[in-house]
Amino acid sequence: MKVILLQDVKKLGKKGDVINASDGYARNFLFPKKLAQEATDNNLHILNNKKENERRQKLAELEAAQALAADLKDKVIKIDGKAGDNGKLFGAITSKDVAGLIKKQFNVEVDKKKIVMDTIKIAGTYNIEVKLYPEVSTKMKVMVVPVQ
């Protein structure tokens, strides 16, 4: 019997896969636990529509991320940090601080975990990488200006 998996099932397949299962296994295990449904023409049509909509949505998200990456590319984030005479900062600048400044200066929400950088402890200019989507990232600069 052909069935459509509604959830990931070990040793059978992933959600959305159409597989062959024995009649007893499908009726007595997969259907009662809502792990699968019968692969009728209507159900297959619905599944194909869902997959097409997901594909379109991912493509739109990818294009939006690429446009955002082009906008943010080589932008400079300026930070005024209290520093001593030798340029060493009182405290440190972390990815959380940079994410807040990106939101403030460019009105773009970026998760702090998506910013690849070392903690900044000395005034200067630093290169960072911002990951906007799994395959899309952009380079930015952080300029730390010492303030007495």
Swiss-Prot record:
UniProt keyword DNA damage, yes or no: no
What does the entry list under GO cellular component? Answer: ribonucleoprotein complex; ribosome
User: InterPro entries, from UniProt?
Assistant: Ribosomal_bL9, Ribosomal_bL9/RNase_H1_N, Ribosomal_bL9_bac/chp, Ribosomal_bL9_C, Ribosomal_bL9_C_sf, Ribosomal_bL9_N, Ribosomal_bL9_N_sf
* Keywords, alphabetical: Ribonucleoprotein, Ribosomal protein, RNA-binding, rRNA-binding
Q: Which GO terms describe its molecular function?
A: rRNA binding; structural constituent of ribosome
Q: Which PROSITE patterns match?
A: RIBOSOMAL_L9
Q: Name one Pfam family in it.
A: Ribosomal_L9_N
Q: Name one GO biological process term.
A: translation
Gene3D superfamilies tied to this protein = Ribosomal protein L9, C-terminal domain, Ribosomal protein L9, N-terminal domain
Instruction: Give a short account of what the protein does.
Output: Binds to the 23S rRNA.
PANTHER family of this UniProt entry? 50S RIBOSOMAL PROTEIN L9
User: What protein family is recorded?
Assistant: Belongs to the bacterial ribosomal protein bL9 family.
| Record-given protein name | Large ribosomal subunit protein bL9
Source organism of the structure: Clostridium perfringens (strain 13 / Type A)
Q: Which gene encodes it?
A: rplI
